[in-house]
Structure formats: structure tokens, C-alpha cells
A protein has these predicted regions:
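Low-complexity, Pro/Ser/Thr- and charge-rich linker/hinge segments at domain boundaries
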Residues: 27-29, 141-166, 175
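Short beta-strand edge segments in extracellular beta-sheet folds
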Residues: 136-142, 252
Length: 252
């Protein structure tokens, strides 16, 4: 019985340790943090962590196309999942990013901002703890409710799902940059229902998954994505939208 009690105690220790973690002070105090902590992280243990870096302009000159970099390379090899959201957006969720062994926990993406808002990226490590990076961005507003520019271009449907991409060697890694032709309609413009890319996978030449992404309507139209991939070899990007359309592109 003593042996069983010790085993049970050992199993409970990690959870007890995580529960005792002091999260620290919110670097961008927000009345919405408690809501999103419960809604997106399930009230799981977390720390505000400067090692999770969010790089965004201090002011969104074009609220429909705001560049954002999420850098969790300080936790390379230990990252399970990366969630990002804009707290005061009407549609806050941005991306659920799950890098595998050869993809570093770094992602670039363009997003829509409706108003000045805290941006968050929560990085879950293998011990179950969430490391939360934060920044503030100011904006004139309207990025989420502005009509699509893509839909004003004649024949845009003929180019739906086309992918432009390139690989840029950087020592032992390569940076992949891709742009996908898609209106990314978020349902907030009158008369235009939701129509957006919601799933993506990055694969190597053998079909092994390098990264999985779930995308949300806060992502800008004609999405831009960037990844850091270790090692050589061709990669393929597989995409699917919420209407069931599937797209594929090879990146040499």
C-alpha cells in the first residue's frame, strides 16, 4: 500500500507543481484576459513570459493587413501548440499552430484588427504549462468589417487557391514564405457569408507532416504565412477552406 501511495503521489506531483506556478503580472493589462484564459486555455496553468515574442507594428496603418510574427524559438523542441488571438476583435481567434520536429516554433502571418487591442500568443510546452506572450497594437479601426478587396477584382474566382511561395536558406534552416489567393470572408460584411481557409498542413517530400495549422477569419485576405524549416528538401502545402475546397502547392 505504501508503494501504491508513493506512485499516486508521484503522478500527482507535476499537476500540483503546475498549479502552484505564479503567473506574474500581465504586461498589457486587459479586462478580457480572464475570459480568454478560461475560453481558450481552459483555465490551465500559465505564466506571462517575455520569451514568447509578438512582433507587430505599434500602429496598424492598414487594419486589414497587419503583419504579425510569433516567435517561441526559445522553447524549440519543447512546443506542443501555439494559440494566437486579438482580444478586442469581434472574431478574436487567429491561428492554432502545431509545429512538428523539423519546424521551429516561429510563424509569420497577416491579420485584421477592428480596433486597438492586446494581441496574445500562448505557447504550450510538453509539461502542459502555457507561456503567454503579449503586445498592444493601436488602430484606426474597421479592419474586420471592411469589404474584401479581392472580390472587387474581375475573375478572382479563377485564381482561388493559387499559391505563390519561395524558400530562403538561412544557415541550417530555410524560411518559407507563401501567399494564398483567397478572400477570407469573415461573415461580418452584409450579404457575404463566411468563406475562409480553415486548415493547412506543411509536409515534406515523403508526406510527413511538418506542421499543422487551424486558421480563423481574423486572418487577412490572400493569407501570407511564413515558417522556419530545418534541413533540406521540397515541401508541400495542403489547404482546405470551410466550403470543402482543397488546394495544394509544392515549394522547392
Amino acid at each position: 500500500m505504501k508503494w501504491l501511495a508513493c506512485c499516486l503521489l508521484g503522478v500527482g506531483l507535476p499537476m500540483m507543481t503546475l498549479a502552484a506556478v505564479e503567473p506574474g503580472k500581465d504586461p498589457v493589462p486587459s479586462v478580457m484576459w480572464a475570459f480568454y484564459h478560461k475560453q481558450l486555455l481552459g483555465d490551465a496553468p500559465f505564466v506571462f513570459d517575455e520569451r514568447v515574442r509578438l512582433l507587430a507594428p505599434p500602429f496598424a496603418e492598414d487594419a486589414r493587413q497587419v503583419p504579425l510574427e510569433i516567435d517561441a524559438r526559445a522553447f524549440a523542441g519543447d512546443v506542443v501548440r501555439v494559440l494566437a488571438w486579438a482580444e478586442l476583435n469581434p472574431l478574436p481567434r487567429i491561428v492554432d499552430f502545431r509545429p512538428e520536429a523539423r519546424v521551429l516554433p516561429w510563424l509569420s502571418i497577416r491579420i485584421r484588427i477592428e480596433q486597438a487591442t492586446p494581441l496574445r500568443a500562448a505557447v504550450q510546452t510538453r509539461d502542459g504549462l502555457w507561456h503567454v506572450g503579449s503586445t498592444l497594437i493601436d488602430a484606426a479601426g474597421g479592419g474586420c468589417t471592411a469589404p474584401s478587396v479581392v472580390r472587387t477584382q474581375p475573375g478572382w474566382e479563377e485564381h482561388l487557391g493559387e499559391v505563390l511561395g519561395a524558400r530562403y536558406p538561412r544557415g541550417d534552416t530555410s524560411r518559407l514564405r507563401v501567399q494564398v489567393a483567397h478572400p477570407m470572408d469573415n461573415g461580418l460584411v452584409s450579404g457575404i457569408p463566411e468563406f475562409f481557409l480553415n486548415q493547412a498542413q506543411l509536409l515534406d517530400a515523403d508526406g510527413q507532416v511538418l506542421a499543422r495549422l487551424e486558421l480563423f477569419p481574423a486572418v487577412s485576405e490572400n493569407p501570407n504565412l511564413g515558417f522556419d524549416v530545418q534541413g533540406p528538401g521540397q515541401t508541400r502545402l495542403m489547404l482546405r477552406d470551410n466550403s470543402g475546397n482543397q488546394f495544394e502547392a509544392a515549394i522547392p
